[in-house]
Amino acid sequence: MKILYEGADIYPDVSVHRCYHDMYAEKQSDELLLKLNDTRELWDSWNPKKGDTIAIEDGAAKTGKMFVESVVPESGIITLRAYSVPQSAKDKRSKSWEKVKFLQLAQEIAGRHGLTLETYGITDQTYDYVEQNNLADFAFFQNRCTLEGAAFLVYDGKLVVYDEAYMESQQPVDTITITPANDFEYRDEGANAYGSAEAVNGGLTGTFAAPNGGDKMLRRILPFRMTDQSEADRFAKGLLRDANKNATVGTLWTGSLLRDYAAGSAVTLATEGVKSWDGTAFISRIRHDYVKTRSKLYLRKPLEGY
């Protein structure tokens, strides 16, 4: 295992008490929680500060470059928290664009925060007018992604933007067999899912109905003008996906560190006790516990047809 602090491996000089790395497929920055026993009182001499870079490596499992948010010493224990987005991500700003493309927004935000852009399955839509009104860049971009059925994550200096349905349909990276002895929990609230959605603003009302959906309708009034009917319908579809995608979720602790797994990918589940879960599951979050060398998967069943 390596702990690379500002590029230097400090692992030989510290004793690691706890090390969690949470990777999120959407809506939240990856987070590192590191607790060190600083019995040799070396930490203070290294002069750590907010914004420093840190990375954990254990074979194929890597946190990528992360940015220190806080370092708290207490009774010989150093508690460090770091995130995959830089400090600049907190800055709020206001700006407007005309005749702007989706990926133009993504590229501009990535560049502003020193990130490179990667995309998967994205349709580069064009908007007549877009306004960012006193919002942090990633909060603003998240709102736009939700409307388009897209999501993004930040990992190792990259802004990765993807179409959710596209990623859910990709070839699973592995098969996980779940037995009654596994620590597997699940929740199915599919009966409470919305069957259709409306996106409303001014004279336009976008609509979308889920395949085999029920009568329950989601209605959202959007605080901005939509370009045309096709855009309004597309936004209704994105809103319905966002409201329903976590209807069936589960968590699974594994007995080992899943070094090759990452949030935003799919796996195949083969279960002995919960056959309804057999098939593809999307990893919405994964926690790597580097001290106990095990992982916790947060899974959701992909939506069908949208």
Write out the residue ranges for each language-model feature.
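Acidic, small/polar-enriched beta strand-loop surface segments
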Residues: M1-Y5, N47, V154-D156, D163-V291
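Glycine- and charge-enriched low-complexity intrinsically disordered segments
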Residues: K95-V100, L299-Y306
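Extracytoplasmic
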Residues: V16, S29-E31, T63, S75-I77, ...
